[in-house]
Amino acid sequence: MEKLAAGLAGLRWSMGAFPLDLIVSRCRLPTLACLGPGEYAEGVSERDILLIHSCRQWTTVTAHTLEEGHYVIGPKIDIPLQYPGKFKLLEQARDVREPVRYFSSVEEVASVFPDRIFVMEAITFSVKVVSGEFSEDSEVYNFTLHAGDELTLMGQAEILCAKTTKERSRFTTLLRKLGRAGALAGVGGGGPASAGAAGGTGGGGARPVKGKMPCLICMNHRTNESLSLPFQCQGRFSTRSPLELQMQEGEHTVRAIIERVRLPVNVLVPSRPPRNPYDLHPVREGHCYKLVSIISKTVVLGLALRREGPAPLHFLLLTDTPRFALPQGLLAGDPRVERLVRDSASYCRERFDPDEYSTAVREAPAELAEDCASPRRARLCLPAPRAPGLARAPGPLAPAPAGEGDQEYVSPDWAAAPEPAAPPAEIPYEELWAHQGPEGLVRPPPGLDLISFGAAGPPRREPEAPPPPVPPKSEAVKEECRLLNAPPVPPRGGNGSGRLSSSPPVPPRFPKLQPVHSPSSSLSYYSSGLQDGAGSRSGSGSPSPDTYSLYCYPCTWGDCKVGESSSRPAPGPLPSTTQPSQASRALTEPLSGRAASLLGADTPVKTYHSCPPLFKPSHPQKRFAPFGALNPFSGPAYPSGPSAALSSGPRTTSGPVATSGPAYSPGPASPGQAYSAAPPSSCAPSSSSSSEWQEPVLEPFDPFELGQGSSPEPELLRSQEPRAVGTPGPGPRLSPLGPSKAFEPEGLVLHQVPTPLSPAALQGPEAGGALFLTQGRLEGPPASPRDGATGFGVRDASSWQPPADLSALSLEEVSRSLRFIGLSEDVVSFFARERIDGSIFVQLSEDILADDFHLTKLQVKKIMQFIKGWRPKI
């Protein structure tokens, strides 16, 4: 120590004094310094030689000691976030004023209307919102709430939504799964069958109506979006967060309490805490404290080198930070001075633990509450644009020019242009987020800050990133928000912009337009989303505890890991408000490796997503499909043919006679169109007519099938092998849509009857098309035994046999099938009213038949056995 003291006594000091933040940013730490002439620092004399150890970020919780039965408030202390002792939560005063309440629906929440609620379980809800009272356009509005989400209630509104008068769960789910939701509303066509679809036996299909649904307007602080929660939304809510309720039992560290409980909160020291030799306030067992707020500050650790040993101390980087002189040999790069610095550092390393010093409990100084109530003021101070001799980088520091020493050193965010009136001592929290648009923001010329020593230019307007897009809301919500005229809600997820600077971010200063008060004067770490990531701020603007680091800021000691000073990756390009000039940035490239961000990296910019539709078909569909929005047989697996071009035509068949809706003809139909069927030997003359229709006709399954020999092939196989009209093959054939040809099979006579057109629905792969045929009367000789099933004639319904594959049945054939298995006419008429064809029929379950259709057990058993292949032996 004697040798070290002799070396220190022989040091010669620079003539000028430098700001502490400039020394920290430009000098290799640790370094030696002493107070400049005329400067004062508490606990430091003019003769003391200081070892500037490191620059650190301290995050502490401000607490009041509670005495005399919680009524007398004692001194205010700072408890570091890394304090190892544990605390137990006491019964809070707010629990007496506002007892914990639980809700099971949004309607219950609206009836009480507390200031804020917390979601106790994940909730997903969906509602169909109509754009207007006289508009058919609608959009599905769905949202998801996560457990622990904090919602601030803002008001109530009503939205127009599409409701259904009555709806059955299982049958509705089946129709939606098949894409046949239109059948629910009775929009299958214009015929009389759909007119009575809403009033059938056993609860017919539901008809959509527009209704006003009351909603609760909330702000979700996790996503920073407003929500409209319908009253009918069910879920568990509470006035306390689930994490806070879990914290009522057990003992917890300060960090755990801050992350999960809304401040202020009263705590008790349940057991004897560990001792720290640097503690300036003893925390004893049984003491009670009120945790008030969280604050973050930048401090410079130092040691006064004295004969009795190093005395640790720290300086807050405020506007009145004292100036220090540096050894002249250090500025000139004298190796003897550098060796003296290394010896001093090794001497202090054995006698000083910076980590323990950083976690000590101290009494909060009174001036800190006044001068540094907001952590945005506790930051690295940037020098004003003076001292042109410092524009050299990274060479030795030059003293300030004479004659300018009387200028007060202030932070450059408001010191570049002198103002007649002093700025307010505190920036309101809402003001930080109001009026952030590019208009009206004229940035003063950049000063000589820690990194860039560039030339100052004229005032210029800095381009700023546009604000994030507004999340999608209904018109009613927008109108309600306009009526509420609520104060601006600051985003709690972070500042949203990346900064890479050696000093904490400084918000732009704006003239205060009107006093705007925060809805809560005590925003906590939990309620403000500090736990969401790096760079996030508490209600008072303090950084996340995750960005707190015990490692020094630009420290280059051997045991200090600079890379751990911030665990976040370097952000992208700088925002224009902190971007240094290109020339000055090039000068400071060697120093950029030592400068780490004190407040962590940026928070990712929030993007908004509108609600996607519930189901998007992979193939194009007509907007107003008559029988449901989707056709189960018209997917990409089925090749397109003539039926694909006809699939959008309206089709309604209910019963033996069907009437068409709009007069729609899918092709150049002539009055002579008819179904024609003949033995294979008689089909050759009609093959020449295929030139009238350029595309091959897919083989349909004749709804009036005449025999066992003409049962259809599977739909997929048949649709993949189209045959031209007139090709020999089993089953009936459809004549081309064109002018009438001379077609005279043996003994078959067609008598034209002037009756209106009626659609004959194509079945199987051609579902959805409609052919309009003239009503005629076919007469022919009785089918001979050798003709078998190929003879064409009108057979009575009693001889009709259902096919093996029921999925291709038409509405009429479903009715025939029900009569075939002996069901009553009221069941048959109910199935006809519900417009159940084969594709729906084969997917009916026992639950749907019994619960939704209210059929008897015998009827349910018959239908289920029939679907599975049972046929009555008649």
Swiss-Prot record:
GO biological process: cognition; neuron projection extension; response to stress; social behavior
Modified residues (Phosphoserine): 735
Ranges of compositional bias, category Low complexity: 388-403, 518-545, 632-650, 658-691
Keywords assigned by UniProt, alphabetized: Phosphoprotein
Protein's name in the database: GRB2-associated and regulator of MAPK protein 2
Residue spans of biased composition, Polar residues class: 575-585
Ranges of compositional bias, category Gly residues: 188-206
UniProt cross-references to Gene3D superfamilies, sorted A to Z: Transcription Factor, Ets-1
Gene: GAREM2
Region feature Disordered, mapped onto this chain: 188-207, 388-422, 437-545, 563-598, 625-742
Its job: Probable adapter protein that may provide a link between cell surface epidermal growth factor receptor and the MAPK/ERK signaling pathway.
Region annotation CABIT: where it falls in the sequence: 12-339
UniProt key word Phosphoprotein: yes
Residue span(s) of domain SAM: 807-871
InterPro entries to which the protein is assigned, alphabetical: CABIT_dom, GAREM, SAM/pointed_sf
Family assignment from sequence similarity: Belongs to the GAREM family.
